[in-house]
């Protein structure tokens, strides 16, 4: 109740609404609802209890524009890598009651919050007319984004053409994720000026103590001596272990067995107390942010949310046993050279053949895996089934190559854009290049020589869009030995020796 009272006091102090007679409402009066939650640190400790009073936006009339972007995780890692390269300091700020800081463009009427009485004594029926945005309104995220974006752009910040939530000037970078903001800066005076101007514009925020250590549930630990940043999600891993009841399990050395996981149509139904989709959701957030080592295993189990069998639940337990052993691990961001973009790409041709029933389209599908690095640090990775059926190993490899290029080229564009604006040493500006490492000779030949035959013409027309970048020398496609293929652990289950060798290369441990 204390958190709820604090919320109402904050909203009234902010001038969020005006109390009016109910007869003044020009549109439907919307009900509200309370949302209570416990905010935790990345390590799972309780940070604070929060209460939000929200509008039932699902009952709104009309179809207003609602889209509001958030920063991509590849941009977060780009931010970290560039801050290490430049040896810039970092910090984060959290805007207080963010959505209610934006002015509402069209009036909205809501009922009085349950448990709180009117400030008048005449006994008339009262409601609230919103002056500012409020949580739950469909337009609230968009209004807040436009409000906070204007606060930064008015100070000379530019939006990246590739990520609207990545802002920069010559000596400072900013990440926007709703009300959480990450900042990297060259000088303390740059930061002081930025924060002072935000305050002058009426924005309320709290600056986190120290460096950029906690962002969206991920803990960042900087080692100034070795110039590294370690990303971990110990709190989420512990939550997964607790949710599956595997606190006392026997740990595994790898997250997946070497046999591919299939549909198992005749298998017994899952018989566990925990929610399969809920655990998969947490595993997906973990695998896409700090743990590429479980990406293949998680991609496999994520196929069966609609009808999980006992074998699929067992596969999740295998992942959890591995996480139990490596609960304090994550990914070490360590610069190994210049700011080159490298892409390791691999494919597993028809890996589900014999595992999924012949009538299932997935039984003939191949798997794509790729890891894109910047300065030797992983910035983006993927393990997924290909959307179309490849007719040969060559076609599967080439499809994977094309998919990775579609992701890598925009990253290169963003890097070039940001580096041009930042005050980077000349040696970094002159060494930006793109390299793609492929271990299939046929795919390598097609990508570099463009030898079109009757057998390859039909898929080259569709997937060979990147040829101009290869021909101009902007992108180099190079041969790599299979034993050095970083993406190998994204396409199949591996034995412990091979798996740990690749994990060391990619994640640093």
Region roles according to the model:
Residues 1-135, 139-161, 166, 243-245, ...:
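Chromodomain-type histone methyl-lysine reader module
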Residues 4, 11, 34, 44, ...:
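Mobile genetic element proteins and their domesticated derivatives, centered on retroelements
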Residues 13, 24-30, 45-47, 82-85, ...:
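Intrinsically disordered, low-complexity regulatory regions enriched in Ser/Pro/Gly/Thr
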Residues 39, 99-112, 135-139, 169-204, ...:
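Catalytic palm subdomain of template-directed nucleic-acid polymerases
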Residues 42-46, 86, 90-91, 117-123, ...:
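Short helix-interrupting loop/turn segments at helix-coil junctions
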Residues 67-70, 74-76, 172-173, 227, ...:
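Divalent metal-binding acidic/histidine catalytic loops
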Residues 92-97, 127-137, 161-185, 211-221, ...:
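Catalytic palm active-site di-aspartate
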Residues 155-162, 182-237, 242-244, 324-326, ...:
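Polymerase palm active-site segment centered on the conserved acidic dipeptide of motif C
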């Amino acid at each position: 109740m204390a958190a709820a009272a604090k919320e109402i006091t904050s909203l009234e102090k902010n001038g969020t609404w005006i109390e009016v007679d109910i007869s003044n409402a020009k549109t439907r009066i919307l009900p509200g609802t309370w949302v209570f939650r416990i905010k935790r640190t990345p390590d799972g400790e309780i940070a604070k209890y929060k209460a939000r009073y929200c509008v039932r936006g699902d009952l709104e009339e009309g179809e207003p524009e609602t889209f509001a972007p958030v920063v991509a995780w590849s941009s977060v890692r780009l931010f970290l890598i560039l801050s290490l390269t430049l040896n810039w300091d970092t910090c984060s700020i959290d805007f207080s009651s963010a959505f209610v800081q934006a002015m509402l463009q069209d009036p909205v009427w809501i009922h009085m919050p349950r448990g709180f009485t009117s400030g008048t004594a005449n006994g008339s029926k009262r409601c609230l007319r919103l002056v500012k945005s409020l949580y739950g309104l469909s337009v609230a995220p968009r209004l807040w984004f436009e409000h906070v974006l204007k606060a930064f752009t008015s100070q000379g910040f530019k939006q990246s053409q590739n990520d609207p939530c990545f802002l920069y000037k010559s000596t400072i970078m900013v990440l926007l994720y709703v009300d959480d903001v990450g900042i990297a800066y060259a000088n303390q005076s740059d930061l002081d000026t930025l924060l002072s101007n935000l305050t002058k514009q009426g924005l309320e925020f709290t600056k986190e103590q120290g460096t950029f250590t906690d962002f969206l549930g991920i803990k960042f630990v900087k080692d100034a001596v070795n110039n590294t940043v370690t990303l971990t999600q110990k709190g989420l891993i512990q939550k997964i272990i607790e949710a599956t009841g595997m606190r006392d399990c026997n740990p595994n050395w790898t997250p997946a067995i070497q046999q591919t996981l299939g549909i198992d149509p005749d298998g017994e139904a899952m018989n566990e107390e925990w929610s399969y989709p809920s655990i998969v959701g947490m595993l997906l957030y973990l695998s896409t942010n700090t743990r590429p080592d479980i990406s293949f295993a998680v991609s496999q189990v994520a196929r069966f949310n609609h009808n999980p069998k006992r074998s699929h639940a067992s596969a999740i337990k295998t992942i959890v046993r591995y996480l139990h052993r490596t609960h304090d691990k994550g990914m070490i961001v360590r610069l190994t050279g210049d700011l080159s973009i490298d892409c390791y790409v691999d494919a597993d041709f028809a890996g589900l053949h014999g595992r999924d029933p012949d009538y299932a389209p997935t039984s003939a599908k191949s798997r794509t895996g790729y890891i894109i690095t910047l300065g030797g640090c992983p910035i983006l990775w993927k393990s997924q089934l290909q959307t179309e059926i490849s007719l040969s190993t060559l076609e599967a490899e080439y499809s994977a190559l094309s998919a990775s290029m579609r992701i890598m080229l925009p990253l290169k564009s963003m890097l070039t854009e940001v580096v041009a604006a930042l005050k980077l040493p000349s040696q970094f500006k002159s060494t930006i290049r793109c390299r793609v490492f492929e271990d299939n000779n046929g795919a390598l030949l097609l990508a570099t020589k463009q030898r079109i035959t009757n057998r390859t013409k039909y898929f080259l027309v569709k997937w060979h869009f990147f040829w101009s970048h290869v021909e101009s020398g902007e992108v180099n496609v190079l041969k790599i030995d299979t034993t050095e293929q970083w993406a190998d652990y994204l396409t199949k289950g591996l034995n412990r020796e091979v798996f740990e060798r690749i994990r060391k290369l990619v994640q640093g441990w």
